[in-house]
Amino acid sequence: MTVLSQFIYYAYEKGDITMHVRSFQLSDVNSVTELMQIALSEECYKETVGAFARQLSWDSGLIVVAEEEGEIVGALIGTIDQNHGCYYRIAIHPDHRRMGIGKSLVESMEQRFQQRKVSRIWVAGDKHNSAAMPLYEAMGYGASQILQAFQKLSILAPH
């Protein structure tokens, strides 16, 4: 891991492929939107796209992307609500799953939450996140960190 100014940067190499996790940039909006359409169910995508747009307008520093060979293959949308960090939605391209990308995204977001001194970190738990729960559990987020009533998160309802 290398820290570049305020941005946390993860990189790994597997054979000839290099992946790195970085902060979302405005130029990523189309790629991340396309990734979410591919990686998420249609219903999940529809529920996520509004929250993605709100988080972008509030604090794009809580959106991280994984990039391989110039292509965005993963994204994690986080948010801070009432001083609690929350992993809201993770999307990994189906061709790049089970390669450690999700873990790298979560580690990067976790550090962002720690830098901002959140009092607690939650995982948004809904029917769409069920496939990601083993990842969060393997990283130490047990049942007590799963936020089932996350519908009240600010990014889910326009103010």
Model-inferred region functions:
Residues 2-27, 156-159:
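Conserved N-terminal entry element of GNAT/NAT acetyltransferase domains
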Residues 139-142, 146-156:
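Active-site/acyl-donor-binding loops of N-acyltransferases
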Residues 123-132, 151-155:
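Conserved beta-strand-loop-alpha-helix junction that forms the acyl-donor binding cleft
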Residues 90-97, 126:
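A short, internal acetyl-CoA/4′-phosphopantetheine-binding micro-motif in the GNAT/acyltransferase core
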Residues 23-88, 112, 143-146:
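Acetyl-CoA-dependent GNAT
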Residues 113-125:
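Conserved GNAT acetyl-CoA-binding A-motif
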